[in-house]
Amino acid sequence: MNYRNKKLLELARELPCQQCGREDGTVVAAHSNQQRDGKGTGIKAHDFRIASLCFTCHTDIDQGSTLTKDQRREMWEWAHRKTMGEFFLRDLISIR
C-alpha cells in the first residue's frame, strides 16, 4: 500500500514551480514515475515522492518528446530535492 497524505499534496501547491519558478496557479504535486517509488500500472508513487511543478514542466517531464528518459528523470529528481528542501526551509513540514 502506497503512502497517501492529502496535506502534503496541498503543500506542494504553495510553492513556485521547482523547475522554472513559475507561480501561475498551475503548480501541483507531480509524482515520481519510477517503480522504485511505488509507481505501478494505474498506481501513483508514494505521496512523499513528489515535486512542485507547473503544468508545462510537469507535462515536459511526464511526456516530453524533446527530452530523453534520463533527462526527464534527472529533472524530476532535481525538482523533488528542491521541493523537499523548500518544505523544511519554509517551515511547512517539521520533524516532531
Spans of features found by a protein language model:
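Short cysteine-rich loop/turn motifs with clustered Cys
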Residues: N2-A30
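Polybasic, low-complexity binding patches
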Residues: G38-F48, T59-R96
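Cys/His-coordinated zinc-binding microdomains
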Residues: G21, F55-H58
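Short recognition patches in nucleic-acid-associated and regulatory proteins
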Residues: G25-T41
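Active-site cofactor/substrate anionic-group-binding motifs, chiefly glycine-
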Residues: A51
